Amino acid sequence: GLDLFVIHVEATDEAGHAGNVAEKVRALENWDSRILAGLIPALDSMGPWRLLMLPDHATPLTTRTHTADPVPYVLVDSAVDGPGGVFSESGVAAEPLVPGYQLVSRLLAG
């Protein structure tokens, strides 16, 4: 069977609305240390897994509001070793735009 769960983190969005770069950095660091650091070992203990991480929308510090700008994403498959990349707003600008439904298809196709 397929297990699927969603984690929604609001802290980065709120920091964007506030225009607070330090809070946005702290929210991302907390995601890494408090959620991702425990999630990966837990997933590993259950067998093969895939993980799609992305924001639901952009909230640039400069505008302090939601925009339709492309967002970065990371799709990880535990069975595939490969080069890492940069997960950033500036990094996504050089990548081709992938519609959300295609990302979900890639996630579930594993």
Where do the PLM segments sit?
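Feature captures the catalytic ectodomains and active-site-proximal regions of enzymes
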Residues: G1-G110
